[in-house]
Amino acid sequence: MKFRKGRPKILRLISEEPQFKLFKPVGIPRTDLESEVLTFEELESIRLVDYLNHPHEDAADEMGISRRVFWNILKSARKKVADALINGKMIDIGGGYYKIRDCNYEDECQRGKFCKYGVSNCLRLKNRDSE
């Protein structure tokens, strides 16, 4: 049995799972492509910093992790995306060590199939559907 050394790993908070989980070059069958696996937390780090222009400190706080851990995740994500774009690889998005951040609209939540606040992959909605 293996034991981890150091501090226990904490779950990274993400806003939601992405709607699209696969990107590939046009005109090449999937079977002929190498792929890069981008975890959900790596995608979230790119979303927060590169898409929403959050400073690293704020983005790390949103994900519930230290700035150092955030920087390592972001660096890994950028390297994978650059490799896929330059070398024509497929990007497969999935996995990781995460949980979906609470949306803070519990009291007003009136979800049918969709959230009026734009949270498309809500845990409460999933739990309600499975009951």
Swiss-Prot record:
Disulfide bonds: none annotated. It holds the Pfam family DUF134. HAMAP family: UPF0251 (MF_00674). Belongs to the UPF0251 family. This is UPF0251 protein MMP0619. It comes from Methanococcus maripaludis (strain DSM 14266 / JCM 13030 / NBRC 101832 / S2 / LL). The lineage of its organism: Archaea, Methanobacteriati, Methanobacteriota, Methanomada group, Methanococci.
